Amino acid sequence: MRGDGDGWYKGPGGVKHWGKFGAAGLLLRAPLPGGGSAVLLQHRAPWSHQGGTWALPGGARDSHESPEHAAVREAEEEAGIAADDLRVRAERLTMTAPSGWTYITVIADADKPLPTVANRESAELAWVPEDEVADLPLHPGFAAAWIELRAVPLRVRLDADTELADALPRTVELPDQGFFWLHARDDGPGAEVVLDGEPTEGPVLTRADVIA
């Protein structure tokens, strides 16, 4: 039922977390002109829990919702982002409380920094360059998770591969290596990676990783 997840989940010792069935948030990336990426962040309204901090659009999951459904819905409600304007890439469990309560971050990409419409839960919304996110006063939970959510930029050599060019830029998650922001700007940030090349000290990527 819509809205049945709103409320505090009370764990042992009276510790509370918002969302009776857990919570989810959307980490939405978009390309910047120089090849880097920006992340959509919400400056939380002063009256809200941890008001004045920066975090992801997100909130309580309803009983019938998947984490993806909840995160995308919350982004539309809190930031005016339509589901058709993003592509989900991955999910990451970013918090588990002793009570069993969980927070899941859904990672997605947009083709460009989209216009936003703030609701009453936001003091403002902003597309923040990825390398500047950690400089903001972040919500404690998001600050702890950002270390594993941040994407490292990599430059992909296209070699006239049009299918590959159409797939970039984008976020990719590699097992045991984390997230990477792939782009094709020769003068953009990050090291160059050769797809399907010989193993190096850096991340090993295949063409299939990019066009998946």
Please place each PLM-identified region on the residue numbering.
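Nuclease catalytic cores that cleave nucleic-acid phosphodiester bonds
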Residues: 163-212
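NUDIX/MutT-family hydrolases
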Residues: 116-150
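Compositionally biased accessory segments in Actinobacterial proteins
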Residues: 88-92, 153-155, 189-195
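Short hydrophobic segments within beta-strands
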Residues: 42, 157-159, 196
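Conserved beta-strand scaffold positions in the cores of enzyme catalytic domains, especially
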Residues: 125-127, 155, 181-182, 204
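Short, Lys/Arg-rich amphipathic segments at extreme N-termini
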Residues: 6-12, 157-160, 172
